[in-house]
Amino acid sequence: LKSRNQGLKISKFMAYLLPVEGKSPVFGENVFLADNATLVGDVVCGDECSFWFNAVVRGDVHYIRLGNRVNVQDGAVLHCTYQKHPLHIGNNVSIGHRALVHGCTIHDNVLIGMGAIVMDGAVVESNSIIAAGAVVLEGTHVEAGSIYAGVPAKKVKNITPELVAGEIERIAKNYVFYSSWFKQKETGGK
């Protein structure tokens, strides 16, 4: 781990962190790594991020950049395309259980639903939701303030400010809170 990771609290059953081509994952402050999360290569994340059980983040073939308060939920996979598509994720983003996010750009305040797929070159603008099970095809541009659903994903409606606060922001904040339960366990309840 790089020097920026000093003081990173992980359990005795440490997450799998692997350097690739001389690059190792780098973490901001107050980050949670589940015991069996896997992060490899050129991955840089901001503060208050969480990587949950069986999450896989592979910055091996290209780089991955995550902002603050990104939660990568159980079984989700983040990856890139060799020499073509890195992965950029903004702030306050929730990647739902078993979602696949591949070589795309996700702006701030976004919820990627459970089992959704977002493919290479797609751009998901801020304050948007990708519904559970949706497939955002390669190169798709998801409009800001919208909900996309289906296979292939299409816009189904505009999002309300209440839904942004009630779902997107709430879930991002909740995952910071949930991670505190595990950090207390790791430090003996302190």
Regions found by a protein language model. Give the residues of each.
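Short, basic, low-complexity termini and linkers enriched in Ser/Thr/Gly/Pro
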Residues: 1-12
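Glycine-rich hexapeptide-repeat left-handed beta-helix
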Residues: 11-26, 60-68, 74-77, 81, ...
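Short proline/glycine- and basic residue-enriched helix-capping loop/turn segments at helix->loop/beta transitions
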Residues: 94
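N-terminal segments that cap or nucleate solenoid repeat domains
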Residues: 15-51
